[in-house]
C-alpha cells in the first residue's frame, strides 16, 4: 500500500472544531510519552508530521491529519491524535479540559471506525487499564499497540505481550500488535488491521 499524501489539518480545542464531512476516522490514544507521535510518523512514513516532544503531555488538543493511500478502503481518511493522559506535571486546568474533549470525541463520532490504544511495552499502568475499561463501556473495542518493543529482548517480548493480553483482558491474539517506530516492526500488521476495520464499515 502506498501513502500518497499525509498532511496536518487542524488542532481542535473544542468539539465544534472537530472535522466535518464523510471521511472515516482512526483515533490514537495513549499515555503521555508512550511514543504516539513517533508511531504516527513511522506508520505514515513521514519524519516529522506529528511533532515529537521530549516533554510528556505536550499534545493538548485533538490533532487531525488527512491521509490519502492506494488502498481501496482507506483511500481517504482522517487520522486523529488524541491528547496523552496520565502525566502529573500537566497543569490541572489543562487536564480538566482533556477529559471532556476526549469524551466528546469518542462518544460522538459516527465516522470513527477504529480506536487504537497505545501501551508502553515496559509497563502497563492502572490508567491504561482504566482507559481500556472505559473505552469498552462506551462501545469501542480498541486495537492494542505495544510500543517501544525494540527496547526488549526477544524472550521478553513474548512474555510482555502475554502479560498485556492478561492485564487488559484481550483474548484475540490479533488485537495486540507489538510495534517499533525505530525498526518498523508491526507496521504492516497495524495497516492490515486498519484496512479490515475500514472494510467492515463499508460492508455494513
What are these regions (language model features)?
Residues 1-87:
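Conserved G1/Walker A P-loop phosphate-binding module
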Residues 100-174:
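Conserved C-terminal guanine-recognition region of P-loop GTPase G domains, centered on the G4
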Residues 18, 59-64, 77, 83-113, ...:
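Switch II of P-loop NTPase G domains
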Residues 22, 48, 61, 75, ...:
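Helical mechanochemical/support elements of P-loop NTPase systems and associated helical scaffolds
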Residues 65, 147, 190:
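Residue-level signal for inorganic ion chemistry
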Residues 69-73, 109, 200-203:
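Alpha-helix termini
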Residues 3-16, 151-204:
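Canonical P-loop GTPase G-domain recognition
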Amino acid at each position: 500500500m502506498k501513502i500518497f499524501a499525509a498532511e496536518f489539518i487542524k488542532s481542535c480545542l473544542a468539539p465544534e472544531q472537530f472535522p466535518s464531512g464523510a471521511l472515516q476516522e482512526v483515533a490514537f490514544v495513549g499515555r503521555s510519552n508512550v511514543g504516539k507521535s513517533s508511531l504516527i510518523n513511522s506508520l505514515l512514513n513521514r519524519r516529522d508530521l506529528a511533532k515529537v516532544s521530549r516533554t510528556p503531555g505536550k499534545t493538548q488538543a485533538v490533532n487531525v491529519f488527512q491521509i490519502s493511500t492506494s488502498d481501496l478502503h482507506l483511500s481517504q481518511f482522517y487520522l486523529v491524535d488524541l491528547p496523552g493522559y496520565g502525566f502529573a506535571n500537566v497543569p490541572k486546568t489543562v487536564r480538566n479540559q482533556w477529559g471532556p474533549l476526549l469524551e466528546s470525541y469518542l462518544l460522538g463520532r459516527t465516522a470513527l471506525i477504529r480506536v487504537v490504544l497505545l501501551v508502553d511495552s515496559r509497563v502497563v499502568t492502572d490508567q491504561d487499564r482504566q482507559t481500556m475499561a472505559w473505552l469498552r463501556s462506551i462501545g469501542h473495542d480498541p486495537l492494542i499497540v505495544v510500543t517501544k518493543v525494540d527496547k526488549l529482548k526477544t524472550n521478553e517480548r513474548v512474555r510482555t505481550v502475554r502479560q498485556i493480553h492478561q492485564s487488559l483482558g484481550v483474548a484475540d491474539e490479533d488485537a495486540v500488535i507489538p510495534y517499533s517506530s525505530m525498526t518498523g516492526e508491526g507496521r504492516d500488521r497495524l495497516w492490515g488491521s486498519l484496512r479490515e476495520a475500514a472494510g467492515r464499515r463499508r460492508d455494513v
